[in-house]
Amino acid sequence: MFITFEGMEGSGKSTALNRVQQVLLDAGHGVLLTREPGGSRLGRTLRSILLDLSNDDIVPEAELFLYLADRAQHVGQVIRPALDEGVVVLSDRYADSTVVYQGYGRGLDPERLRELNDMAVGGLWPDLTLVFDLPPEEGLRRAMTRNLREGTSVSEGRFEAEHLAFHARVREGYLTWAALHPARFRVVDATRTPDEVFEDVMRAVRSVLSAPARP
């Protein structure tokens, strides 16, 4: 079972992901928690390039292929082996982030990005993708507060530094992409309390866990 958590910066997806992991572990499931970029050894190097605030001159096409390289390595080295062992894989971001951020956000063709991602991951798409939705102003406020608290404003603050219009396009991109793929996506209202959000998340997770396994 492969479940991905998507959304803007500061949407609360990482917090929910950790809570889901604990519930599944308590229920006896094997669980792998991972993230993009940075879910493999190579990916950690790429993450330091992609998220560093000082790398503000990366052109959209170069950014795209760095993410695709991270993802191909992540799937081949981490995700597929875990799925082959029957482990539930929970990933903080995956291919849909590239479709939305580089497509709707940067202006590249979303459908072409889906095709490139499909090649990078060998056709491996999630069983469930949760999109945590909230206004970009609120998400940025939360994300900047977190980065200041954790001291990552420079090392992981490149997207938080983007102008508000970019984040508005990202939000609309997520909602548009989710509407185009309703069988896999669930949109979660992330403006509510963490407990209310988590109730919705677990409802969706339990639904997909109880469904017949895909071939």
Curated annotation (Swiss-Prot):
Residues that coordinate or bind ATP: G7, M8, E9, G10, S11, G12, K13, S14
UniProt-listed CDD domains: TMPK
Name of the protein in its database record: Thymidylate kinase
Xref: NCBIfam families: DTMP_kinase
Keyword Transport recorded: no
Gene: tmk
Matching HAMAP family: Thymidylate_kinase
InterPro entries for the chain: P-loop_NTPase, Thymidylate_kin-like_dom, Thymidylate_kin_CS, Thymidylate_kinase
Function: Phosphorylation of dTMP to form dTDP in both de novo and salvage pathways of dTTP synthesis.
Organism (species): Nitratidesulfovibrio vulgaris (strain DSM 19637 / Miyazaki F)
Pfam families, alphabetized: Thymidylate_kin
